[in-house]
A protein has these predicted regions:
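Short secondary-structure transition hinges
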Residues: 49, 88-128, 161
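C-terminal peripheral helix-coil segments that are non-catalytic and often amphipathic
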Residues: 85-88, 92, 124, 128-132, ...
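Helix-turn-helix
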Residues: 7, 11-49, 53
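Hydrophobic alpha-helical connector segments
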Residues: 53, 67-95, 145, 149-152
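Hydrophobic/aromatic residues within well-ordered alpha-helical segments
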Residues: 47, 54, 58, 62, ...
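Short, hydrophobic secondary-structure boundary micro-motifs
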Residues: 98-100, 138-142, 191
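All-alpha amphipathic helical-bundle segments outside canonical DNA-binding/catalytic cores
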Residues: 77, 81, 114-118, 135-151, ...
């Protein structure tokens, strides 16, 4: 991707995050880039191209955060590191993360199918961490990994609405982790 195309995608992501995909026009993007509307079409075929590229960037960033987790780490540490990575992506790529969470519905056809598949694959990777924790007895034996993954992702995905610049995302992730996972660990009850 050329430098200009990358700048264009970043600017579109910023506007999509602020105004929504449908609230952003090609004219808005051109104005933000300081170019004529028609000149954008030398770089893109449609506004949806920019939405797709933003979505692709988001999917790649979230998957890369999971890829960085050491395979030999204990399962609960992997969950903590996944949460840290997710919040770090949100903090470092706020516009992209916002668009990835909110605007994916506006893609059409094969592009939508691809991004939905990437989102599902990410969710499955998170579920697998909880499944591993349960199977290794690091988490409760009756843990529903689907519910656990949805809870974690529901909390983490909305970070774009409240995360303040400069906040330590690892500290926030560790607090979330303590609240979420401590209730999922095994416990003993009196006989």
């Amino acid at each position: 991707m050329s430098t200009r195309r990358r700048e264009l995608t970043r600017e579109a992501a910023r506007l999509f995050a602020q105004k929504g995909y449908h609230g952003t026009s090609i004219g808005d993007i051109a104005e933000a880039m300081g170019v004529q509307k028609g000149s954008l079409y030398a770089h893109i075929a449609s506004k949806e191209d920019l939405l797709y590229e933003t979505m692709r960037e988001g999917a790649d960033a979230f998957h890369a955060a999971l890829d960085a987790i050491p395979e030999n780490a204990p399962a609960v540490d992997k969950i903590r590191l996944a949460l840290r990575g997710h919040l770090r992506v949100v903090a470092e790529q706020l516009d992209v993360a916002t668009v990835f969470v909110q605007e994916w519905r506006y893609l059409e056809g094969a592009r939508r199918d691809e991004i939905v598949a990437e989102r599902r694959r990410y969710e499955e990777r998170i579920r697998e961490l909880f499944r591993e924790g349960r199977e290794l007895s690091e988490l409760r034996a009756d843990l529903d990994e689907t519910a656990a993954a949805l809870l974690l992702l529901s909390a983490a995905n909305w970070a774009y609405t409240w995360l303040q610049p400069g906040r330590d995302t690892d500290e926030i992730a560790d607090r979330f982790f303590a609240l979420l996972v401590d209730g999922m660990r095994g416990y003993s009850t009196p006989a």
